[in-house]
Swiss-Prot record:
Coiled coil segments of this chain: 170-198, 503-540
Location of the protein in the cell: Chromosome
Protein name, as recorded: UV-stimulated scaffold protein A homolog
Gene Ontology, cellular component aspect: chromosome
Region annotation (VHS-like) ranges: 24-170
Bridged cysteine pairs (disulfide): none
Function recorded in the entry: Factor involved in transcription-coupled nucleotide excision repair (TC-NER) in response to UV damage. TC-NER allows RNA polymerase II-blocking lesions to be rapidly removed from the transcribed strand of active genes.
Keywords, alphabetical: Chromosome, Coiled coil, DNA damage, DNA repair, Metal-binding, Zinc, Zinc-finger
GO biological process, any: response to UV
């Protein structure tokens, strides 16, 4: 039987698939084995294997490599795309075949790295990472532009021109903006570190101040403890002996057994050690307060993290030493401590101490005892009385008079700052859920001016400086009204003669002008009345004729035009069309929005 020959292209396709699989595996492994700072390790074994695969490829194999890189880029986020961009940069500068294939068709590369088509291929992730990727890509393209191998290449120039004309890429100023943002963040970090340093310095000065006080108090506490309970653990200095006793005599001395029921020392307060005990308790209480203050300082320093760790640890060590001293002082039992002496009031300074005899004291005590006996007897009698008698007494009693003040509240609280109780209005009192009143809705607030202002009256008769109007009326008489400045009918009061004419020329001209204006107003009113009567007779009356103002007329006219159904339909159609275009522009590639 004849064997069928396999076609040659099958073996070629298998080799391409194998190389593609190897490149993809090396690429994935290479991306997984990145360093923590986001930079590629060009000395790693996966990178060397990937470099060998690219170097061994021909033109078709190189196209396959670019396809694998672009496919991986499309499925990766912006941080991984920055790493793949470094691979593109490395292969572009090392292998001419890779460079030629990439420059022949850079459209997909530009879409994935520069977001030249944000509707079709938007950058994934946050906007911050996208801007960083764009800046990195612009830096790479600018470095390619300066290379000798592609400096005079028309394709490279077209690529740069395309990026400059694209409105989605700021090719000229993109790096400058990122640099300005980086400088701004650096300034903020420096300012933050300076504030932290100042805080640490403040806490350090506070700690040293507390430390100086605590050392003084510790010395005082230790001294008083040694005075109250002498320490027998320290070795006493050797005292030279004057006796002629020999060591054999010392060895022959008798031994004693001492039984101590409780090792906790007890101190009974007496007149001899009263001052020492008081100083001991005061020093211990002050040290407890210092320990609490140091604890608060440590909590605040822990919020600063690394800059305040050293000082916080120093404070903790010092605080533990003070705490041990306070715990040691707590072991002392003080029996019958004297209560603290009451401070003398300032009002007692005006009194003089007078010696009272024992007879006077006995008389006062006897009088107090008699008063107590009388009160107890009255209470027992009231209990035994009948309830009817008690009711009769209640009726006979006069009502208690309410105390009144013979002057107003303004004098009672004169010069004092008083805040009256505010009664909030609850706007939601009819709702089934209670909520607090809104701000600004407070009622029942009394006027504060009544406590700071007062009207004073003067005794005597005020001089009558009122003038007579003397303006001529329609009846021919002169106006007899009196007032200080103006007459309610004729206006300003001026000097007039016996016939009612103003004496001054200016006042006479002003009065003539006022009369002319009044005549014009009356003529205008008569004209309006005549026109209205004529219109009412000739003009057809509307069905619902309502008198409206000018602003209401404008509102009605605009309402008639804007709220027309055809106008609303036309405007809503335009708004829907613009909204649909905006959605299609931003989310056209996502079917879930339509």
């Amino acid at each position: 039987m004849l064997k069928r020959r396999q076609p040659k292209y099958c073996s070629f396709m298998d080799s391409i698939d194998n190389s593609t699989t190897i490149i993809r595996k090396n690429l994935n492994r290479f991306i997984r084995e990145l360093t923590d700072d986001g930079k590629l390790d060009f000395e790693s074994i996966p990178y060397q294997n990937l470099q060998k695969e690219v170097a061994n490829q021909d033109e078709e194999g190189c196209e396959n490599v670019i396809e694998v890189l672009l496919d991986t880029t499309s499925r990766s986020g912006c941080p991984d795309r920055k790493l793949i961009l470094q691979l593109f940069n490395s292969f572009f500068l090392q292998f001419p075949i890779f460079r030629e294939n990439l420059l022949n068709d850079p459209s997909e590369f530009l879409e994935l790295m520069f977001e030249t088509n944000p509707i079709r291929n938007p950058l994934p992730g946050s906007k911050k990472h996208g801007n960083e990727l764009k800046v990195e890509a612009i830096t790479v393209i600018k470095s390619w532009e300066k290379e000798k191998c592609v400096k005079n290449d028309a394709r490279m120039k077209c690529l740069v021109v395309t990026l400059k004309k694209t409105k989605f890429v700021d090719y000229e100023n993109g790096a400058k903006k990122i640099e300005a943002e980086r400088k701004r963040k650096k300034i903020l970090e420096e300012r933050k570190m300076k504030m932290i340093e100042n805080s640490v310095n403040v806490y350090s000065s506070k700690y040293h101040e507390i430390k100086n006080d605590a050392e003084t108090l510790s010395m005082e506490l230790t001294t008083t403890m040694q005075m109250l309970v002498p320490s027998f653990t320290t070795a006493d200095p050797e005292v030279p002996s004057t006796s002629t006793s020999t060591p054999s005599a010392i060895s022959d001395s008798k031994s004693f057994e001492i039984f101590i029921p409780d090792l906790t020392p007890e101190i009974s307060v007496s007149s001899e050690n009263d001052a020492i005990v008081e100083a001991f308790l005061g020093a211990k209480l002050s040290l407890i307060h210092r320990v609490q203050t140091l604890r608060k300082l440590v909590k605040r320093l822990q919020l600063l993290k690394q800059p305040g760790e050293k000082l916080a640890q120093e404070i903790i060590d010092y605080r533990d030493g003070i705490k041990n001293l306070v715990l040691k002082a707590d072991e002392l039992r003080i029996i019958n401590p004297r209560p603290p002496k009451n401070k003398r009031k300032k009002s007692d300074d005006d009194f003089i101490d007078v010696d009272i005899s024992i007879d006077d004291i006995l008389m006062v005590q006897y009088a107090e005892k008699l008063e107590v006996d009388v009160k107890s007897k009255d209470e027992s009698e009231k209990i035994t009385e009948s309830p009817e008698k008690h009711k009769i007494e209640m009726k006979n009693e006069k009502p208690v008079k309410i105390k009144t003040v013979p002057f107003g509240l303004d004098l009672k609280y004169w010069g004092e700052e008083r805040k009256d109780v505010e009664v909030p209005k609850n706007n939601a009192d009819c709702h089934r859920f209670w909520r607090s009143a809104d701000e600004g809705t407070v009622a029942g607030k009394a006027q504060q001016s009544i406590y700071t202002q007062r009207q004073y009256t003067f005794i005597g008769k005020a001089p009558d400086n009122r003038k007579v109007c003397l303006a001529k009326m329609k009846s021919g008489k002169l106006c007899p009204r009196k007032d200080y400045y103006t007459c309610p009918l004729h206006g300003k009061i001026v000097d007039r003669d016996d016939e009612g004419r103003p004496i001054n020329e200016e006042d006479r001209l002003e009065e003539n002008y006022r009369k002319e204006q009044n005549h014009l107003k009356e003529a205008d009113k008569i004209r309006q009345m005549i026109e209205k009567e004529y219109e009412s007779k000739t003009k057809r009356r509307k069905k619902h004729d309502v008198d409206t103002t000018a602003s209401e007329d404008v509102r009605n006219r605009l309402q008639k035009k804007l709220l027309d159904p055809k106008t609303i339909q036309r405007v809503s159609a335009d708004l829907d069309a613009s909204r649909k275009n905006r959605l299609e522009k931003n989310f056209g590639q996502q079917f879930s929005h339509f």
